């Protein structure tokens, strides 16, 4: 595959990931504005899927480079956006909302580590 095919696959995956994240933000942020809930859930879902995919890649080398570029680099890279998370934390800290900033940071980091690990275990369970 050539560079343009790879860029096309990444772009297609990224478009779907960005639309998914935006949809989650519109749907969930109004429920818990304190937590930027849509971004949190997007990161949790993305990390869960990433854990499953990591376990799949470790288990089998049958997954093509193109598959990884579309799903991991494109879709998940766009769905789980660290820039949105960091912006939300910094906004809270600059407004002296220390508890909110620390809570968002803790939930994202610990939750994402948990869901990535859970994804690995889910894949192993079904093997």
From Swiss-Prot:
Catalytic activity: fluoride(in) = fluoride(out)
Membrane-spanning intervals of the chain: 7-27, 37-57, 70-90, 102-122
InterPro entries according to UniProt: FluC
One GO term of the biological process aspect: cellular detoxification of fluoride
One annotated Gene Ontology cellular component of this protein: plasma membrane
Molecular function per GO: fluoride channel activity; metal ion binding
Domain of life: Bacteria
Residues holding Na(+): 77, 80
Keywords, alphabetical: Cell inner membrane, Cell membrane, Ion channel, Ion transport, Membrane, Metal-binding, Sodium, Transmembrane, Transmembrane helix, Transport
Pfam family, one: CRCB
Role this protein plays: Fluoride-specific ion channel. Important for reducing fluoride concentration in the cell, thus reducing its toxicity.
Protein family (similarity comment): Belongs to the fluoride channel Fluc/FEX (TC 1.A.43) family.
UniProt protein name: Fluoride-specific ion channel FluC
Originating organism: Histophilus somni (strain 2336)
Gene encoding the protein: fluC
